[in-house]
UniProtKB/Swiss-Prot annotation:
Disulfide bonds join 74-80. Bone protein that constitutes 1-2% of the total bone protein, and which acts as a negative regulator of bone formation. Functions to limit bone formation without impairing bone resorption or mineralization. It binds strongly to apatite and calcium. The uncarboxylated form acts as a hormone secreted by osteoblasts, which regulates different cellular processes, such as energy metabolism, male fertility and brain development. Regulates of energy metabolism by acting as a hormone favoring pancreatic beta-cell proliferation, insulin secretion and sensitivity and energy expenditure. It comes from Homo sapiens. It is found in: Secreted. Gamma-carboxyglutamate residues are formed by vitamin K dependent carboxylation by GGCX. These residues are essential for the binding of calcium. Decarboxylation promotes the hormone activity. Belongs to the osteocalcin/matrix Gla protein family. Residues 24-51 form a propeptide. The keyword Calcium applies. One of its GO terms (cellular component) is Golgi lumen. Ca(2+) 2 binds at residues 72, 75. The keyword Disulfide bond applies. This is Osteocalcin. GO terms for molecular function: calcium ion binding; hormone activity; hydroxyapatite binding; structural constituent of bone; structural molecule activity. Keywords: Biomineralization, Calcium, Cleavage on pair of basic residues, Disulfide bond, Gamma-carboxyglutamic acid, Hormone, Metal-binding, Secreted, Signal.
Length: 100
């Protein structure tokens, strides 16, 4: 009984494999490589929301923080960085380096 079941499964597998080998690709698959798509088709599949748009496209680009260079200077000094955690960046920077 097991041998008959195994033989039937093998025959079914052979028919499936033979059917796939003889099949021809459709017109869309034969004209293009199956592994590659155009840039336009790829961008239609993966549409990411844009964070920053240019002004002429609708939304303005966010302005950079003018205090960011000073904040980085304060972060590089361990004492200023520690004090900034307690009393705030602007006050810590003022105490170490003068007016902001």
């Amino acid at each position: 009984m097991r041998a008959l079941t195994l033989l039937a499964l093998l025959a079914l597998a052979a028919l499936c494999i033979a059917g796939q080998a003889g099949a021809k690709p459709s017109g869309a698959e034969s004209s293009k490589g199956a592994a590659f798509v155009s840039k336009q088709e790829g961008s239609e599949v993966v549409k990411r929301p844009r964070r920053y748009l240019y002004q002429w496209l609708g939304a303005p680009v966010p302005y950079p923080d003018p205090l960011e260079p000073r904040r980085e200077v304060c972060e590089l000094n361990p004492d200023c960085d520690e004090l900034a955690d307690h009393i705030g960046f602007q006050e810590a920077y003022r105490r170490f380096y003068g007016p902001v």
